[in-house]
A protein has these predicted regions:
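Mixed-charge (Asp/Glu-Lys/Arg
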Residues: 1-147
Length: 147
């Protein structure tokens, strides 16, 4: 199912996780699975793209995502023996979260990335996406001063 950003914004946490898993699956990620709700070590989705295994934390927020999500994603990556960690949100990140992600290597997938996943959604999950979702490396300079 293709999702609009407005639909994603209104979803409850667990439903949002399943929607993100579906979006990833239909954008070329493989072996996509939603982890158990409890004892997930901060990781909501495990997925593979090319030869990289991702540990992904989902945050459906109305505010900015902070340090805690970045810390949990990094720890969860180690627990699940993944190659990379990411936090995906329908929102944005605090400066502190961006700074921590820069030093730990956790990838921050923001609202723009989520929208690109939705726009590139292919009905047949085995088709290649129209365009590869653009993953930006967020830097402190990308975060407005009032955050």
């Amino acid at each position: 199912m293709k999702y609009t950003i407005d639909e994603l914004d209104k979803m409850e946490g667990h439903k949002f996780e399943y929607a993100v898993a579906d979006l990833l699956r239909h954008n070329g990620y493989r072996e996509v699975q939603v982890t158990q709700a409890s004892n997930d070590y901060g990781i909501d989705i495990l997925a593979r793209r090319k030869n990289v295994k991702y540990a992904i934390q989902c945050k459906r927020y109305t505010g900015h995502v902070g340090n805690k999500a970045v810390q949990e994603a990094g720890l969860g990556m180690d627990f699940y023996h993944c190659d990379a960690a990411a936090v995906i949100t329908n929102s944005s990140y605090t400066k502190q979260a961006v700074k921590l992600a820069e030093t730990t290597g956790v990838r921050l997938w923001d609202r723009s990335f989520l929208i690109s996943l939705s726009q590139n959604y292919k009905d047949d999950e085995y088709e290649r996406p129209v365009r590869r979702p653009v993953e930006r490396n967020l830097k402190i300079a990308d975060v407005p001063e009032n955050d």
